[in-house]
Amino acid sequence: MFNNKKFIYLLCMSFSLLINIKAQTFSNETFIIETTFGQIKLKLYEETPVHKANFKKLVLNRFFDSLLFHRVINQFMIQGGDQLSKYSNTGDSLGHGDIGYTLTSEINPKLIHKKGALCAAREGDDINPKFESSASQFYIVMGKSRTLEDLKKYEDRINKTHYNNCAREFIKSKQGRALKQQYNRLTNENKLDSAYIINSLIENSTKIEYLKTSEYHFNQKQINLYTTIGGTPHLDNTYTVFGEVTEGIEIIVVYKFICF
């Protein structure tokens, strides 16, 4: 049986070659995660400067030294960066540690959750509708290959998430609060026909906001990647992807065999 503690040491070193590809531009540093099973090498994206600068700062300050991959979900991802994991014991609940600030979302449609993607963890949509990122917790996508039917379901889920966020934002507005209060009052008074009319007004206003942006659909590049090497496509457009594994992807695969 493997020991529960999987140590992570992140070191930054100079890398002389700047690599350019169509989808994204790599920064000129390589970040190395030293694990029990070997090295994982990362490159960060120039398209996400806030996340890149923050990650580099934490590495140089040795924040990640001896932290754990505290969350491992087979065919999904491995997650680390919780400062509470440094001195944790077997069975401790982890994943709630933070460092007092969040990062503005840098979601970019070109940067996707393919296998090996480095992404920022965050709080859920209900309390974080702007998709702000955790400053320290990150995950690396493990994922699996998907079918075209899977991708259609994920498109629907992403669009539903956007619709729900539009609804929450409308209810926070002055007009939305007034309509919601009116709806609640009519419901309590059992005036259901009138309540239905008010609810229709709320839904129509939400749809107007929702339709201000185009519905989300995977492009051909995403389809090709997700149906071959795989990933977690349902997280696209909702979490910030700010880098990727360039060497050592096989180390991530090893973690799927570990039981916590």
Segments from the language model and where they lie:
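Bacterial Sec-dependent N-terminal signal peptides
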Residues: 1-27
